[in-house]
């Protein structure tokens, strides 16, 4: 609550965002990250343990290009329209309009086509997630909502392999949590 989206980039020519708020949490708006599941099938290209890192970097490079080095933003209504135009969705869905508002961002931003950042399968999953959230929080998927991205660092892009009892190839080591690639 009362938060902002900030540029959290750590590499030249790439852009990642993250949400933050001051301790008082008294800003005018709130923000939330809508996360989609990404599996190796979404990004396997080189068949190396670092494929997830390469994919993350590709998304961040796409975001950097989309916003010309600034945080790329787009109204949800336009995002949906672009997905329909590209055949990713059959029809647009966005909730009843809420009162328009300014994006709660810190740093420079630029309006852009966010559908160019992720592959079609992830854009579709994102839109489905927004629709599902709107069933729980009315207005969540309003066409007036500002999207910005990409928040690509919610979990490690490298997953440590585990066996059937969740142990790594080193006896007694049980990888878990975000750092091991097992968020959620």
Please describe what each predicted stretch is.
Residues 1-184:
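Residues forming the flavin
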């Amino acid at each position: 609550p009362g938060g902002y989206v900030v540029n959290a980039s750590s590499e030249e020519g790439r852009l990642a965002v993250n949400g933050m708020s001051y301790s008082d949490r008294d800003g005018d708006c709130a923000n939330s990250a809508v996360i989609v599941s990404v599996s190796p099938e979404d990004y396997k290209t080189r068949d190396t343990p670092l494929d997830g890192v390469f994919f993350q970097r590709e998304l961040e490079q796409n975001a950097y290009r989309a916003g010309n080095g600034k945080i790329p933003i787009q109204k949800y209504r336009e995002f949906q329209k672009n997905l329909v135009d590209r055949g990713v969705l059959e029809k647009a869905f966005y909730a009843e309009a809420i009162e328009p508002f300014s994006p709660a961002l810190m740093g420079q931003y630029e309006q852009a086509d966010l559908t160019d950042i992720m592959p079609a399968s992830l854009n579709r999953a994102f839109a489905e997630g927004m629709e599902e959230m709107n069933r729980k929080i009315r207005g969540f998927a309003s066409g007036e909502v500002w999207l910005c991205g990409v928040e690509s660092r919610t979990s490690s892009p490298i997953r440590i392999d585990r066996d059937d009892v969740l142990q790594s190839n080193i006896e007694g080591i049980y990888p878990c949590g975000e750092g091991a690639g097992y968020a959620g």
